[in-house]
């Protein structure tokens, strides 16, 4: 009896040549395509291609809503930005892809799961770490990494096994895309001194060509999650799609930075994440209005750790679950509306309100005579606030000189 294997299939050359190779190795291949919002992909054609090149079964799963609700929403609530810039675009889809692959493997009594990652990147770790966590007994195949095929060798193998070679094979870029953004690397981008050409971008307009008039949008949040755009209630999936389109035409969401990869090397990455730039800026602004000071000061520490965990393939981990429980507890009062100004590559919060959860008290904050703040109480507060430092300094004189005793 032939063993069954489940393949994470994209329709590209790497995973297409993997199918006949895995068949030659003795597997019946189930090719799985996960729709997480890839731009401009005909998934029906990809499904048919998998069958044409030898897959026993080809499955397309529409996972956009689940991706938005279960994976993007936590990133928004936790303001997750790896190294302060990367909104977890590719890293975010991997846990969901693996979850679906493992489920399908179990449903079909498969003994192995395969992916098309190379040995240079983070994805091999993300795929295999999640597989090990969800099913330690599952065998893993990684033909592209394990045999280190060159592009020329892949093309030759494809031609020998009647695998169609994509017409865009001469593209210099390696692209990964989902609902939350687009990642681009390789080619001319590998030299960090080369400015990214315009053909490296697809979701955003060049700032020079962006509209000369700003656009304003209102984003409504409930428990830290966007739920409405300009007053219209939308699913998170549809809201992200809408904001991507609006913000993209204003040149918002381009990221060009040097990234510290999980495998220990630095890489130059180009990202486009228009909705992420707008929604995360709006969310942080609303938190400034609704979070208590100690929580607001401590939360960024947790946010950074969560970003590292997601990037480093530890979405399935007890620490991630524990830290997200803290994040969820902070978001119950993050309710309100933020007005965003979109203009020439910038997404700026210009107004905000929270009817029931705002901690801003205009009567206390005003500098007019109508202020209800008791300024006289400040004198005693300051003395008590600085008491421990005052005592220490007067005993040790680290920053001051001791007073000389005068004898009369």
Swiss-Prot record:
Q: Which reaction does it catalyse?
A: L-citrulline + L-aspartate + ATP = 2-(N(omega)-L-arginino)succinate + AMP + diphosphate + H(+)
Q: Where does L-citrulline bind?
A: 86, 122, 126, 174, 259, 271
Q: Which PROSITE patterns does this one have?
A: ARGININOSUCCIN_SYN_1 (PS00564)
> Which is one Gene Ontology cellular component term of this protein?
cytoplasm
Q: Name one GO biological process term.
A: L-arginine biosynthetic process
Which pathway, metabolic or otherwise, does it act in? Amino-acid biosynthesis; L-arginine biosynthesis; L-arginine from L-ornithine and carbamoyl phosphate: step 2/3
State a single Gene Ontology molecular function: argininosuccinate synthase activity
Q: Which UniProt keywords apply?
A: Amino-acid biosynthesis, Arginine biosynthesis, ATP-binding, Cytoplasm, Ligase, Nucleotide-binding
Enzyme nomenclature, EC number: 6.3.4.5
Q: Where does ATP bind?
A: 8-16, 116
Chief localization class?
cytoplasm
Amino-acid positions noted as binding L-aspartate in the UniProt annotation, renumbered to this chain: 118, 122-123
Q: Where in the cell is it found?
A: Cytoplasm
What PANTHER family has UniProt attached to this entry?
Answer: ARGININOSUCCINATE SYNTHASE
Task: Spell out the subunit comment.
Answer: Homotetramer.
Family the UniProt entry places it in: Belongs to the argininosuccinate synthase family. Type 1 subfamily.
**Could you tell me which HAMAP family the record lists for this protein?**
Arg_succ_synth_type1
Q: What's this protein's name?
A: Argininosuccinate synthase
Q: Which organism is it from?
A: Leuconostoc mesenteroides subsp. mesenteroides (strain ATCC 8293 / DSM 20343 / BCRC 11652 / CCM 1803 / JCM 6124 / NCDO 523 / NBRC 100496 / NCIMB 8023 / NCTC 12954 / NRRL B-1118 / 37Y)
Q: Please spell out the taxonomic lineage of the organism that makes this protein.
A: Bacteria, Bacillati, Bacillota, Bacilli, Lactobacillales
